[in-house]
Amino acid sequence: MGTNKPVVIGIAGGSGSGKTSVTKAIFDHFKGHSILILEQDYYYKDQSHLPMEERLKTNYDHPLAFDNDLLIEHLQQLLAYEQIDKPVYDYTLHTRSEEIIPVEPKDVIILEGILILEDPRLCELMDIKLFVDTDADLRILRRMQRDIKERGRTMDSVIDQYVNVVRPMHNQFIEPSKKFADIIIPEGGQNHVAIDIMVTKIATILEQKVNL
């Protein structure tokens, strides 16, 4: 465990942009080190007080869908080298699960999510802010493949959700948050040059913290 504050790397971008691929590439490079991934997707608000018909209306691409207060509290605890109990979201019941995941503090924290750069409070806690920028056509294709294969969705339902929810929310909230990024990575996880540059930058920051 380091004596200094952990390094926080924020990785944002639209759904299907390749955030997870970039996150995994960075994590794999430093997996011999003290590193963890904290996903914003785990921090959707608890909706157990709402009837199912109301939960089904949830817009998961809107900033208000996230419990950023809890996410910030947990991130601050990790920065103080304290363990957290990460919540788990049940997409079947559209509310927070009773399950929790204990997370031990690490020297490097990768914070990943579509809207992490939209909240100034989260931005203030990040040492490096990345935005994974990928063409909209490629993002919808990736989302269709994921939702049909992994979540049992129909193609029509995925397209309908993209047109009526995902695209408008991306244009209104996610795309504008790109201006808060320190580095923009085009072509998502396929951009190995950009990922290598990021790995070098992170290694430099880690070395500087060790030598403080």
Swiss-Prot record:
Pfam families cross-referenced by the UniProt entry: PRK
A Gene Ontology cellular-component term: cytoplasm
Superkingdom, taxonomy of origin: Bacteria
Listed GO biological process terms: CTP salvage; UMP salvage
GO molecular function: ATP binding; cytidine kinase activity; uridine kinase activity
EC number: 2.7.1.48
Location (main, coarse): cytoplasm
Record keywords, A-Z: ATP-binding, Cytoplasm, Kinase, Nucleotide-binding, Transferase
Broad class of enzyme this protein falls into: transferase
PANTHER family membership: URIDINE KINASE (PTHR10285)
Protein name: Uridine kinase
The species this protein was found in: Bacillus cereus (strain ATCC 14579 / DSM 31 / CCUG 7414 / JCM 2152 / NBRC 15305 / NCIMB 9373 / NCTC 2599 / NRRL B-3711)
Native organism taxonomy: Bacteria, Bacillati, Bacillota, Bacilli, Bacillales
GN (gene name): udk
